[in-house]
Amino acid sequence: MAYRESFYRYLMTQRDADSSDEIAQFANNAQHDLTFPKQEQDYEKLSDYLELNASYLPSMYIFDRAYRMYEDKMMY
């Protein structure tokens, strides 16, 4: 089975403190979330966590977009 990095690790590649992009802002904020499930890959588990704990995420649509990008990258 091929190695698949965690969503958090992928998300950290999207950080950009100077960007106004929503995914970059999500990544910037997630970096400071000490309880973010850093080893998780599962969409449902991540979604549940974010819905309950991520007040810094203005819309779950941003997570959905970021997760689709993550899935696309993991296919290669």
Curated annotation (Swiss-Prot):
UniProt cross-references to SUPFAM superfamilies, sorted A to Z: YozE-like
- Domain of life, source organism: Bacteria
Q: Which family does it belong to?
A: Belongs to the UPF0346 family.
Name of the protein: UPF0346 protein lhv_1069
Please name the source species: Lactobacillus helveticus (strain DPC 4571)
